[in-house]
UniProtKB/Swiss-Prot annotation:
Uppermost EC category: transferase
Subunit structure and binding partners: Heterotetramer.
Family per record: Belongs to the bacterial/plant glucose-1-phosphate adenylyltransferase family.
Pathway: Glycan biosynthesis; starch biosynthesis
Modulation of this protein's activity: Activated by 3'phosphoglycerate, inhibited by orthophosphate. Allosteric regulation.
GO CC terms of this entry: amyloplast; chloroplast
Domain of life: Eukaryota
Protein name: Glucose-1-phosphate adenylyltransferase large subunit 1, chloroplastic/amyloplastic
Function: This protein plays a role in synthesis of starch. It catalyzes the synthesis of the activated glycosyl donor, ADP-glucose from Glc-1-P and ATP.
Keyword Transferase: yes
Pfam families named among the record's database cross-references: LbH_GLGC, NTP_transferase
Organs and tissues of expression: Endosperm.
Localization (cell): Plastid, Chloroplast; Plastid, Amyloplast
């Protein structure tokens, strides 16, 4: 299936999502007559002026309808998508997602059966009308570069006057090593490329994005708030509880939404000091007492001049946005927070990645790839329909091109071109699939030779497991981690255990009768 996007953003309707329902995912619309409520919501949740036509809080993707409001492109504070550029950070070594990142960059890790993590920010950009995109890459970038080329340069996407450019870490005369030292340093090292491009394209604002998150967002609503607040920097923030707070950068705001303090992954007393007054959040979420912290989503909007000044002049020796630049910038720059209450999951660890994938199978799902108005894009594939032969399925994601025979699959994600043989049981597992098919004849020859074909052999039982691409798992194998081991390294045997989850390596072979 091929999608054609019209990315002409000079004019046209501006989409404002409306959602009915209870809980944190509800969007609270303001009544025209509720002036006091309007003022409180504007000040406490958005930190400044809001759109002249409709007032809303940005919420989740699970909404039954979309309201259209004509954008007033002639007004002074109108954010023009043609003057916005996006930078997607490819990440470092990806140590927390190892071993999934042993041969690929973090944004190239498969997710949701048929996507890659890079497809999330890329698709959000296109759906927001932003078509001038840079991707910073460094470690194990071959598969990432290949996926971007196949999907976005050959996939039928209409860029109009925009483009997607991959900027890979490279040697410079003044810095022969060439490696990025942090998120900010990756942009600084290519500032000469970006500065020339921004000048030529008349760019005003830059959206900086992460490549290891799962969410749906209209970035232009974030940019619109940034422009109306006349902020130097705007940080997209999500309300979180205490269990998640210490794992993220936290912001503290005043009643106008201005960021007073930014603290990267605080602990103990520092964590407690970052609590936000709940009356600041009560109009954005239903249970502000339960979510008293505001976590930075790693999504920032910078004025172009502010970003260039910070990286080229003011903080030339600082390398990271979260731990170094933003905590200092809040002291002498206008830094605003924009509260996002939709589904957002940082999948930068094995545990969070595993849980986010399995959550896709639940009903109702907190996150849904199926939205015709804001689709997610990935590489076009010419695959046959999945063949199911006497299978039992319960809460399962099954991708294209799979061959499943007399197996039982429950609460699992099955990637493209997966082969599961008769008598197999998969539960609470993520199977990423395969790059290519092995024909029945090829598989039979391998079995006769005592070898293992790609896929899962007969009568194998698997639970609580991630199976990377092209893995070969024999017959009568048991992978359940029955001893409850939390951490283990067995690369010579083709697997690791992280947070109690067994991870079968890419291209690994697990022989017949093995027990893990």
């Amino acid at each position: 299936m091929q999608f054609a996007l019209a990315l002409d953003t000079n004019s046209g309707p501006h989409q404002i999502r409306s959602c009915e329902g209870d809980g944190i995912d509800r969007l609270e619309k303001l009544s025209i007559g509720g002036r006091k409520q309007e003022k409180a919501l504007r000040n406490r949740c958005f930190g400044g002026r809001v759109a002249a036509t409709t007032q809303c809080i940005l919420t989740s993707d699970a909404c039954p309808e979309t309201l259209h409001s004509q954008t007033q492109s002639s007004r002074k504070n109108y954010a023009d998508a043609n003057r916005v550029s996006a930078i997607i950070l490819g990440g470092g070594t990806g140590s927390q997602l190892f071993p999934l990142t042993s041969t690929r960059a973090t944004p190239a890790v498969p997710v949701g059966g048929c996507y890659r993590l890079i497809d999330i920010p890329m698709s959000n950009c296109f759906n927001s009308g932003i078509n001038k995109i840079f991707v910073m890459s460094q470690f194990n970038s071959t598969s990432l570069n290949r996926h971007i080329h196949r999907t976005y340069l050959e996939g039928g996407i209409n860029f109009a006057d925009g483009s997607v450019q991959v900027l890979a870490a490279t040697q410079m005369p003044e810095e022969p090593a060439g490696w990025f030292q942090g998120t900010a340093d990756s942009i600084r090292k290519f500032i000469w490329v970006l500065e020339d491009y921004y000048s030529h394209k008349s760019i005003d604002n830059i959206v900086i994005l992460s490549g290891d998150q799962l969410y749906r967002m209209n970035y232009m609503e974030l940019v619109q708030k940034h422009v109306e607040d006349d902020a130097d920097i705007t940080i997209s923030c999500a309300p979180v509880d205490e269990s998640r707070a210490s794992k993220n950068g936290l912001v503290k705001i005043d009643h106008t939404g201005r960021v007073l303090q930014f603290f990267e992954k605080p602990k103990g007393a520092d964590l407690n000091s970052m609590r936000v007054e709940t009356n600041f959040l009560s109009y954005a979420i239903d249970d502000a007492q339960k979510y008293p912290y505001l976590a930075s989503m790693g999504i920032y909007v910078f004025k172009k001049d502010a970003l260039l000044d910070l990286l080229k002049s003011k903080y030339t020796q600082l390398h990271d946005f979260g731990s170094e630049i933003l905590p200092r910038a809040v002291l002498d720059h206008s830094v605003q927070a924009c509260i996002f209450t939709g589904y957002w999951e940082d999948v930068g660890t094995i545990k969070s990645f595993f849980d986010a994938n399995l959550a896709l199978t639940e009903q109702p799902s907190k996150f849904d790839f199926y939205d015709p108005k804001t689709p997610f894009f990935t590489a076009p594939r010419c695959l046959p329909p999945t063949q199911l032969d006497k299978c039992k399925m319960k809460y399962a994601f099954i991708s294209d091109g799979c061959l499943l025979r007399e197996c039982n699959i429950e609460h699992s994600v099955i990637g493209v071109c997966s082969r599961v043989s008769s008598g197999c049981e998969l539960k609470d597992s993520v199977m990423m699939g395969a790059d290519t098919y092995e024909t029945e004849e090829e598989a039979s020859k391998l079995l006769l030779a005592g070898k293992v074909p790609v896929g899962i052999g007969r009568n194998t039982k698997i639970r609580n497991c991630i199976i990377d691409m092209n893995a070969r798992i024999g017959k009568n194998v048991v992978i359940t981690n029955s001893k409850g081991i939390q951490e283990a390294d067995h690369p010579e045997e083709g697997y690791y255990i992280r947070s109690g989850i067994v991870v079968i390596l890419k291209n690994a072979t697990i022989n017949d009768g093995s027990v893990i």
